[in-house]
Amino acid sequence: MDEHRSRTPSIDSRNYAIPEADYLPAGIDIDRNGVSESDDSSDDDAQSSLFPTESSGTLWMNQIQDTPMFDSSKFLFESVNNAINDIDFSESLAIQAKTSALINSKSRELKGLIKQLQEKVDYYNERFKRGAVVSSQLKVNLQMLSKRIATLDDLFSKQFPIEYNQSKEKVMERTLND
């Protein structure tokens, strides 16, 4: 039951390549350097009709046929195999995963800190507004009390001048001693 599978592709694309002999008539052979005549000699007009000039755009087909066939399935298999087995590839994936996790973690941490900061800003903003209202009320109360004290001071200084001056002197002595 232990089967060992081949690591080579199951289909060889070279099996399906059309041989060069099928392209040409029987009287002409192709070698790597170009066109040569076989035993059956033909005139130059016949050769020129089979192989058009460069300006006709078909010369490139002859040049392509001279190059070896490209095995795309082998190339694809080797590319995938190298990519999967390559240690650098797995290390880069691991580093990328760690970096992504770190960025995600820091992003969540920053979002939490921003939320806490916003809550504190809202809290202190509300306290400042209440403090502004309280301070304006205190200012009004202090102004009203200073007017009452000034009124009482005038009233006591006129109705009880002797007692008023004695108490004023005691207060002055107390502040000088301290």
UniProtKB/Swiss-Prot annotation:
UniProt region (Disordered), positions on chain: 28-53
State where the protein is found. Endosome
Membrane-spanning segments: none
Record-linked Pfam families: KxDL
UniProt GO cellular component terms: BLOC-1 complex; endosome
* Keyword terms: Coiled coil, Endosome, Transport
The protein's matches in InterPro entries, at most eight in alphabetical order, are given as: BLOC-1_subunit_KXD1, KxDL_dom
Q: Set out the biological process GO terms recorded for this chain's protein.
A: endosome organization; regulation of protein localization
Q: Which residues form a coiled coil?
A: 101-130
Return the Acidic residues bias intervals.
37-46
- Homology family: Belongs to the KXD1 family.
The record describes the protein's role as:
Component of the biogenesis of lysosome-related organelles complex-1 (BLOC-1) involved in endosomal cargo sorting.
How is the subunit organization of this protein annotated in UniProt?
Answer: Component of the biogenesis of lysosome-related organelles complex-1 (BLOC-1).
Can you name this protein? Biogenesis of lysosome-related organelles complex 1 subunit KXD1
Species of the source: Kluyveromyces lactis (strain ATCC 8585 / CBS 2359 / DSM 70799 / NBRC 1267 / NRRL Y-1140 / WM37)
